[in-house]
Amino acid sequence: MGEIIEAVYQKGVLKPLRKVSLREGEIVKVEIRETKKVTGRFYAKLRELEKRIERVEGAHRELEEIRDDRY
């Protein structure tokens, strides 16, 4: 079973921020991702999507104007 959890690194030890279902001594693989970097990339993608949405909405308005002018 795999899951993603948040942890804090303190005094050389990764400490989960919530209870995990592991047996004592169980070996796991850990992927380190800095939250700030992930969050920064996420917000950059959101800004990119907002710009795309604005372009689509602008095109939609123009098409409505053309339709209204014709009919």
Curated annotation (Swiss-Prot):
Keywords, sorted A to Z: Toxin-antitoxin system
UniProt entry tagged with the keyword Mitochondrion: no
Domain of life: Archaea
InterPro entries: AF2212-like, AF2212-like_dom_sf
Keyword Transport: no
Family classification: Belongs to the UPF0165 family.
Function: Possibly the antitoxin component of a type II toxin-antitoxin (TA) system. Its cognate toxin is VapC17 (Potential).
Protein name: Putative antitoxin VapB13
